Regions:
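N-terminal secretory signal peptides that target proteins for export/translocation
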Residues: 1-6
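Bacterial N-terminal signal peptides
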Residues: 8-19
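Short, compositionally biased P/S/T/A/G/V-rich stretches that sit at domain boundaries
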Residues: 22-53, 57-59, 79-87, 232-237
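Short beta-strand elements
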Residues: 25-28, 71-74, 79-81, 90-91, ...
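Signal that preferentially marks extracellular ectodomain short beta-strand elements
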Residues: 38-44, 180-200
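C-terminal capping alpha-helices of c-type cytochrome domains
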Residues: 50-52, 58-62, 69-79, 158-184, ...
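Sequence/structural segment immediately N-terminal to covalent heme-attachment motifs in c-type
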Residues: 91-114, 126, 136-139
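Axial heme c-ligation environment in periplasmic c-type cytochrome domains
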Residues: 108, 117-128, 141-170, 181-192
Length: 237
């Protein structure tokens, strides 16, 4: 009897220690994201284009050596009224819908702001704005494909995206696709444009925030370390 009691106690103790270790285990490290250009606190004329470069390191891989696809990097250019304000450095979390967009082949035909093989997300958001069934319609187009919605072209189906993922993308397009204060650019390098939603003041500019959108290891988050936010002040308004 004493042996059984000791054995039971040992099992309970081992279970408690295991649970404690699991609770104490630190979360898996997130990505290291650095905007290497433009320089922080740089200045650029409104309406001008500036170049950007982002490096991402995660799970022993890096964009420097093309081990992480360029499509797994996203840059957001957000208008800020005062580049010296603390809020100008508080980047919003990356919407999960944009993770789905960049991990699928959406960017092969769609751009955020310009027409390419298909309409831009901004144009789609404007066309369907205010329509009560817009989210369901867009989600169905994403999952099942469509024909004739934008001229004579057709959109292929995306069965790799589940209903919840397609709905999240549709909701984002309707709520934020045509937001004049934020523009998104896919890729580890490229160009952004200094655009303001209205007449900018003398302290206004853009907050550039970079994100890793690729797959994560179990327990990891997208909370990035590194210089993933820089501010560019607009000139010549």
């Amino acid at each position: 009897v004493q042996f059984k009691v000791l054995a039971s106690f040992a099992v309970v103790l081992a279970s408690s220690l295991t649970a404690a270790l699991l609770r104490a285990a630190p979360p898996a490290p997130g990505p290291q994201v650095d905007i290497t250009s433009p320089a922080d606190h740089s200045r650029l004329a409104w309406q001008a284009r500036g170049s950007y470069t982002v490096t991402v390191a995660y799970d022993g891989k890096s964009t420097r050596f093309d081990e992480i696809p360029s499509s797994n990097v996203l840059l957001a250019a957000t208008f800020v009224a005062d580049t010296d304000a603390p809020a100008a450095r508080r980047a919003a979390p990356l919407p999960e819908a944009l993770v789905h967009v960049t991990q699928s082949n959406c960017m092969g035909c769609h751009d955020f702001n310009a027409s390419s093989g298909g309409p831009s997300f901004a144009a789609i958001g404007k066309r369907y704005a205010g329509q009560p069934t817009a989210a369901a319609t867009l989600a169905a187009h994403i999952r099942n494909g469509s024909r004739g919605a934008w001229g004579s072209g057709s959109m292929p189906p995306h069965p790799d995206l589940g209903p919840a993922q397609a709905t999240a993308i549709a909701d984002w397009i309707l709520a934020h696709g045509a937001d004049p204060a934020v523009r998104y650019y896919a890729g580890k390098s490229g160009s952004f444009r200094m655009i303001a939603p209205g007449k900018p003041g003398p302290r206004a500019g853009l907050m550039l925030s970079a994100y890793y959108t690729g797959p994560l290891k179990s327990g990891a988050t997208r909370n990035a370390s590194g210089r993933n936010v820089v501010v560019v002040t607009g000139t010549g308004s």
